[in-house]
A protein has these predicted regions:
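Adenylate-forming
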Residues: 27-30, 75
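Short, glycine/charged-enriched secondary-structure capping and boundary segments
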Residues: 4-8, 30-32, 161, 191-192
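Ser/Thr-centric signal marking residues that sit
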Residues: 22, 35, 184
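Conserved active-site segment immediately N-terminal to the catalytic lysine
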Residues: 1-26, 54-59
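Short beta-strand-to-turn element immediately C-terminal to the catalytic PLP-Schiff-base lysine
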Residues: 17-18, 31-37
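PLP-dependent aminotransferase class I/II
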Residues: 38-200
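Short glycine-enriched loop/turn motifs at secondary-structure junctions
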Residues: 24-28, 115-117
């Protein structure tokens, strides 16, 4: 993802990226940290390798944050196909955008000057009750949208108590539609038809 020609990984001190199996670029598990600060970058590097830089040079506490050879091989196998994957995912996003009833739901608006990676297609429904109706109708057809952003993080134990009414409202009403390379037009038509009919 870029904004005004600049990678989003260039904003802030440290950016993170997941390589989980559900992500655009995947290794099965793992992820990456991006940092433009040399000292901080060295500190993170040592932390991911038990605090070591080689067998005898110890810098402090650390974890085993390395991905396995198998996971690295998976990433290398996916990498040459990223252009095709992005093109296919864009066509899925375009189909959803052209065929969903936006009088009864909304989706994200991509800012001008943004190059997007088509990682998710979230829809925002009027209420959690309507979301559950749509989700149940899709599930009955063996289609499984996900609630990736539920529950609102302020409701989980270690941060419980913070008042975040907007987050709570949106988290309860966001549903992410199936989005992967290879979804057929027939499957997409089935998904959009079920959603639109559920909203009648």
């Amino acid at each position: 993802v870029t904004y005004k020609g600049k990678s989003i990984f260039d904003f802030g001190d440290v950016s993170t990226c997941s390589f989980h199996a559900t992500k655009l670029f995947r290794t099965g598990e793992g992820g990456a940290l991006f940092c433009n600060d040399t000292d901080l970058n060295h500190q993170m590097y040592f932390s991911h390798n038990f605090g070591h830089n080689g067998p005898l040079d110890f810098h402090g506490l650390g974890i085993n944050g390395k991905i396995s050879e198998l996971q690295a091989a998976m990433g290398l196998a996916v990498l040459p196909y990223m252009g095709e994957i992005l093109k296919s995912r864009k066509s899925v996003v375009d189909f959803y955008s052209d065929n969903l009833d936006f009088k009864k739901l909304t989706t994200i608006k991509i800012r001008e000057n943004t190059v997007w990676n088509y990682s998710y297609y979230p829809i925002l429904l009027a209420s959690e009750t309507i979301l559950q109706k749509v989700q149940n109708a899709l599930n009955e057809a063996k289609i499984f949208p996900r609630r990736y952003f539920y529950p609102s993080l302020n409701t989980i134990d270690f941060v419980k108590g913070a008042s975040m009414p907007i987050s709570e409202s949106i988290a309860s009403r966001v549903l992410c539609l199936p989005l992967y390379a290879g979804l057929t037009e027939e499957e997409l038509l089935q998904i959009t038809t079920i959603i639109n009919q559920s909203l009648c």
